[in-house]
Amino acid sequence: MDTILSPRTTTGSTAPLRTGAEYLRAIADDGRRVYVDGELVRDVTRHPAFREGARSIARLYDMAADPANRERLTYASPADGAPVLRAYQIPRTHADIRAKRLAAEAWAEATFGLMGRTPDHVAGFFAGYAAKPSVFAAGGQQFADNVVRFYEKLRDNHLYASYAIVPPQIDRSKPAHQQSDPSLYAGVVREKDGGIVVRGAQQLATGGVFSDYLYLSCIHPLQPGDENYAIGVAIPMNAPGLKLLSRRGFAAKAENAFDYPLTSRFDETDSLVVLDDVFVPWEDVFIYRNTQICFDQWWKTPSHVYGNLQAQARYATKLRFLLGLAKRMNEATGHDKNPPVMVQMGELASLATIVDSMVQAQEVMAKVEDDGVLWPSRNTLYSVMALQSEINPRMIDIVREITGAGMITLPSSERDFENPEIAADLDRFLGTPKQAARDKVALMKLAWDFIGTEFGNRHQQYEKFYGGASFLVKMNVFRNYDFDRATGLVDAALSLPPLAAE
Ligand SMILES: Cc1cc2nc3c(=O)[nH]c(=O)nc-3n(C[C@H](O)[C@H](O)[C@H](O)COP(=O)(O)OP(=O)(O)OC[C@H]3O[C@@H](n4cnc5c(N)ncnc54)[C@H](O)[C@@H]3O)c2cc1C
């Protein structure tokens, strides 16, 4: 199908909560152009690289549509009181922020923290934009109206947006407009009746192949001359001219769910976005040729903190899963009560607890900034994000250390258990007094899929970079830390009264 089929939407009233089946129908064979292994994928819900990832997202929609989860995963739309995803809630009280975190945790638990860009991530960014439309109005009131209308459309139709907000790594030594070809980085190339035309590429749309909409913008600092790249626009994933060039689809290479229990189910995929003269109607343009607003959207609205509150709740959940894996592996190897291993487990638990506590501190230290909207604590958020690129590899390394060869001394695949010539050997030498060989192998394969497979290693890169390079996050902490209070202490120490004897 080559026509644009926008996801089924309602205007003016809230659609019934979307089920998983409705979500899958909406993205199936809708004309989106996804490329993997040299092939154009017509239907991501059927292709082996994407099918199970799409079903994992569908399960999240089913959870939210289940009346048993109404309070945890939804809230009443301000439009008409009907339930909508809590990720779209604009928090006004501490209880609201807590409720948003609990919703994010519920979905993160369902994916073991292994899918970062689920529909609740970019939802947080749009909630942040709608909380502070005045930032967009600086370019003209119509842009503020557009972003609020689009937010309401996402919210009231339970839609899934992904984003690509980083220019491709072509030549980082030059600004956007001085690249060898001015249409390498995604930007506007001309206006056309009723809208604008966008051309170029942007990285890296995690979950893009599964989403309804792409938000295309730029978080990298732009310079004078870069105005054409200073845009913020929403594009349906099946818009003509939009192509998603997926990285290797790990799930397609995962032979079965026993050997690759995580790869086979939770590969959210990452895609380079290519725009071949994509037309965007004015109503889906929120920022137009304005470098200041392009910058301010991240830092002068609560978008970045709402989106990353979800990201951190997801990460804390993933670390809890890692702790569980390590504990079960120690039980399997007989090291669980070995004091040096207990010390290492204590270090792991400390690091996981720091992350978890920092997520909760974002709520506790949240403040109403203006417009009656609550912002999670930026300093707390950015501090834990800044240390993530050190904490994460440290934790993975400890788990590698305590496991020895446990994740490697494994049958080559599930099929080895079916060969009578070796099945008895596997049962005898891989089992433990408490655990049948097959159960122990399943556990170790689960851990290896988390840590050592291509899927596991991509996750380590993801945790390093999903919130931007760590030097940038540290700059955020620098900008937000209360240095006045710190230097005040130094000044007080320097002006202490003389000692009695002096
Ligand atoms: C798995 C994964 C998923 C992602 N998902 C998304 C997504 O969904 N949407 C999206 O928009 N983006 C996504 N990203 C992209 C991510 O936002 C970028 O990778 C990130 O912003 C870093 O940019 P870069 O990769 O271009 O690195 P660069 O900006 O090129 O930097 C690379 C390295 O160079 C060094 N460096 C560069 N400049 C400096 C400097 N001034 N000072 C000190 N050191 C410097 C640092 O070591 C830095 O880490 C994802 C990335 C990964 C790896």
Predicted regions and their residues:
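Glycine-rich flavin
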Residues: 75-213, 218-233, 238, 243
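Acidic/polar, glycine-rich intrinsically disordered N-terminal extensions of enzymes
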Residues: 1-75
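Charged/polar positions within long, soluble alpha-helices
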Residues: 166, 331, 357-364, 393-400, ...
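Extended amphipathic alpha-helical segments enriched in small hydrophobics
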Residues: 310-368
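Alpha-helix capping/hinge segments and adjacent helical runs
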Residues: 379-502
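FAD-binding core of flavoproteins
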Residues: 168-314, 478-502
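Generic structural signal for well-ordered, non-transmembrane alpha-helical segments
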Residues: 51, 55, 152-155, 317-320, ...
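Short, charged, amphipathic alpha-helical segments
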Residues: 339-346, 374-382
